[in-house]
Amino acid sequence: MRDDQNFIGKEQVKRMDIFESMKKRRPVKKFKRVPIPEEKLNSVLGSMRLAPSAANSQPWKFIIVRDDQMKQRLASACQGQRFIADAPVLVVGCATIAEAYPYLGMYMSSYPMDMGLALSLGELAACQEGLAPYWVYQFHNEKIQELLSIPTGDVNVVFILALGYAEEDGEPDGRKNLSEIVRYEKYS
């Protein structure tokens, strides 16, 4: 994989319907044991790489895990989400805190937001590629760091993205109506 490779080419942009990908994204907890072609994985990773970040800091590193034994170990550190071990690929999203913009909103580091943007684009690209993404957000950071030899202190595990083909369709998430979440001119 080349650094300068354009993962989202003109032909893909023409066929991409972002709204369709948003609608078809579902939490899937059962994966087929079918390998993911390298081109599809690179499309997902390339989309994550293109995510915006505060001051273009790009504080992310993505660890790709395919080894079945390692996936089992990681799943055991994910608080009851053992099904992720059945996904052909786990993408472990790590943030290097020192590389993130330090004062988002003048009170916090940008890395949680930066990583969330990368995760969102990765999920949408996965849907576009016919893959089922599952965002793992409950895990023991220290155990994951130990298993994957991630440096402690300045690097945090922010998410694990399980990728595969859905064995069965996930249930749609309930969504609040716009009237419940949108305010005009002021909060109240």
Q: Can you say where each PLM-predicted feature lies in the sequence?
A:
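A glycine-rich helix N-cap at a beta->alpha junction
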Residues: 82-87, 150-172
